[in-house]
Amino acid sequence: MQLKKAFWKLASLLPLSLLLFLGGCDKKLAVLNPQGPVAKAQYDLIVWSFLLMSLIIAIVFILFTVILIRYREKPENMDYEPPEQHGNTLLEIIWTLVPVIIVIALSIPTVKATYASEEVPKESKHIKPVEIYVTSANWKWLFSYPEEKIETVNYLNIPAGVPIQFKLTSVGPMNAFWVPELGGMKYTMDGMIMDLYLQADKPGSYLGRSANFSGEGFTHMEFEVEAKTKEKYDKWVKEVQQTAPKLTEDKYNEIVKPGVVGRMTFSSHHLSYVDPKSLEYCDYNYYKNKK
């Protein structure tokens, strides 16, 4: 009886401890603050998975507690001998089917969300996506706008409400491009182009970062994503085209060398003299000097 009372006293303290723990969270986690359709779909998947697993954990602990209390050894059943059994068909079917059902319940929405993230969000299929090439290097990010014929370093401007088709690649070690409030991460790799679709629902500033350790300058691989209204975005593009310097090959070679740089803006892009689909893009300087 005393054991039972002690257990329920400890159990009653659990909600209070959780409240105290959550009280230390003074702002929203970026992953749990979706600001676009891709991030919202992934957020819904996280919530569904969390609720399902929480339900499973709760059922397991309740059953464990009930069995522990109900069937514990007592003075009146010291001589109890359990019946000899060689199996229970019903129980074996249940504990085989339950895990299968759990896996199916998790797999179906996960597969649907994963495949949906590989194309333009369904809410914006009628809108032409803006194409941006993302190149990771040690230790900076290069963003090339082929249609606008401009390029930025360590910051990114996009139109709000318009899907963005990112073309991810690398001129250094493998990295991971991640804007938590807009969607999940995807790797950037030498000699490969990976597509990633993201979209910001409204104007705002969102932090992007590297999610894959790439050496001593890894902590500096953060960038700002600013979503602008269509009018402000078009105005920014025109200003860059008219006022920013050209990105020459020499300047590009200097930028991609290992090191930390600040924000840069150019009125041309390196895609005009480097083909990201070719093997040479893996290590542009190496192949250029080899020739």
UniProtKB/Swiss-Prot annotation:
Keywords: Cell membrane, Electron transport, Membrane, Oxidoreductase, Respiratory chain, Signal, Transmembrane, Transmembrane helix, Transport. It catalyses: 2 a quinol + O2 = 2 a quinone + 2 H2O. It holds the Pfam family COX2_TM. InterPro entries: CcO_II, CcO_II-like_C, Cupredoxin, CuRO_UO_II, Cyt_c_oxidase_su2_TM_dom, Cyt_c_oxidase_su2_TM_sf, Cyt_o_ubiquinol_oxidase_su2, QoxA. The chain crosses the membrane at residues 49-69, 91-111. The keyword Signal applies. Residues 1-28 form the signal peptide. The keyword Electron transport applies. It is found in: Cell membrane. GO terms for molecular function: copper ion binding; cytochrome bo3 ubiquinol oxidase activity; cytochrome-c oxidase activity; oxidoreductase activity, acting on diphenols and related substances as donors, oxygen as acceptor. Belongs to the cytochrome c oxidase subunit 2 family. PANTHER family: CYTOCHROME BO(3) UBIQUINOL OXIDASE SUBUNIT 2 (PTHR22888:SF18), CYTOCHROME C OXIDASE, SUBUNIT II (PTHR22888). This is Quinol oxidase subunit 2. The lineage of its organism: Bacteria, Bacillati, Bacillota, Bacilli, Bacillales. The gene is qoxA.
